[in-house]
Amino acid sequence: MKTGRHNIGDDTYFFATSGERQTINRRALVLGETSTRAVPIEDVNAMEKVFNNQDFSEVVRFPDKTKSEIIAKMEELFKSSNESDVNYLYLTCHGGEDGTIAIGSDGQTFSGWELASLLKQYKGKFVVMLDCCYSGTIIDVGKPDKKVASKSEERFDEQAFLAGFSTGDVASKNGEMLDSKFLVLCASWKGEKSYSLVGVGSLATRYWAMGTGWDPLQNRMISPMADTNTNGKITLEKLYQYSYPLVLEDASQIHEEQHVSVYPKNSQFVLFQK
């Protein structure tokens, strides 16, 4: 059998050169820049619960940290990763129309190119779940010229907020995570904002959590809503198919559009298990 990951039934295994099956260690880093009302700490709370409800080797909650602190934490958590491992990175924050990810509490951002380059230093597969405006830029999904007006519920000047961030001289382009190393869920298309509701949290994060079996509103475990065939496996495609119509519907209630996006399409890679 060839080296690498192989699906056997509903499970994914990693085979080394010797042909022996190896254990897949999973670890998660939960990030959030929650200094403004539009990015609620409840997002971080929900995804921390999601990961802690799984049999992961390590889950690290790390919100409201500087860019340098985040980079150091990535090194600490992911440096021991093997090729057989799966690493999860969740980010909730503001995002710019140019694809910048405003995750640093010190006013520093990551470009998609910079984030992808950092993660490529480490062995293993990366599952990236990004809940921010224009997040689909990192996988080049959506309408690039779509302009979405700021909604009154945000109650702050988002462009002025983002103007305070600096990405330095790092080059940026679309589709930085279109790479076999990554499995990616984005809260919106590259031409759209990502919305949150008071008392609910961010729309995409809410349904990603519920899809895996955690209700962030009731703060309790539930049956995994994305497990449509009840086999106890939540694949990337299942979570995408579950969250996409619900986020779109909820956004329409505030007269906006928000399309969850995914890479790669139709992936049967198992992200979570019951």
Task: Please give the residue ranges for each predicted region.
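Extracellular adhesion/carbohydrate-binding repeat motifs centered on closely spaced tryptophans
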Residues: 1-22
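Cysteine endopeptidase catalytic domains of the caspase/legumain-like
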Residues: 23-274
